[in-house]
Amino acid sequence: LGSSLVGSLYILDEPSIGLHSRDTDRLIHVLKELQALGNTVVVVEHDEEIMRAADYLIDVGPDAGRLGGEIVFEGKVSDIKRIEGDINDKNNAESKQLLEKYPRSYTIKYLTGAEFIEVPKSRRPWNMAIELKGARMNNLKGVDVKFPLNVFTVVTGVSGSGKSSLVKGILYPALKRHLDEVADTPGEYSSLGGDWKQIKHVEFV
C-alpha cells in the first residue's frame, strides 16, 4: 500500500482484522493517501472507524446466507448522522428519514445510534484463575498473567505486541498438555498454576 501508483483500483478484504485501534487509524491514513493520489479504494469491512472514514457506503444484507444478497443501503457516509436525544426531535429529522428509507440495514441502525450494544451494569465477580508465569515467546518478555475463570476476558494490545503468542502460542498448548491432550509444543514459560484443574476441556476456535 505504500506505493505511489496513480489511477489504480485498490481492493482490500477486511484489512482491519487483528488490528488495534491505533493501527486502524494508521490504515485509514494510508487509504486516504491512496485516494488523494487519484486512486479508487474499495474495502470490504465492518469496522466502524473505517466505515465512518469512507466517502461512500454500500451495505449488503439484510442477513446472512439465503437471507442476504441484497443491497439494503447505498449512499454517502456524510448523510449518516448520529441520533442525539429523542429520535423525534427536529435535529434528528435526517436520521429518522434515513432509517425509514432503509429499514432493513442493520449498519445504518448502528451508525445512527438507533440500535447499540449495551454496556453491562455490573461485572461478574471471580475468585479462581489460571496463573501463567514467565511467558517468553516472540515479543513476550517473561510476563506473568492471570486468566480469571468463569468470566469473559479480552486480551488486547497493538498489532505485534504478543497477544497471539500469549494465548495461542503458550496458554492453549500448555493447558492442553496439562490435561494430557495432544498439542503442539508451547512457547517457553516458567509455570502454569492456579486453578487450571477446574478446566475439563480446551477449545481453540
Regions found by a protein language model. Give the residues of each.
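Conserved phosphate-binding elements of NTP-dependent enzyme cores
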Residues: L1-V205
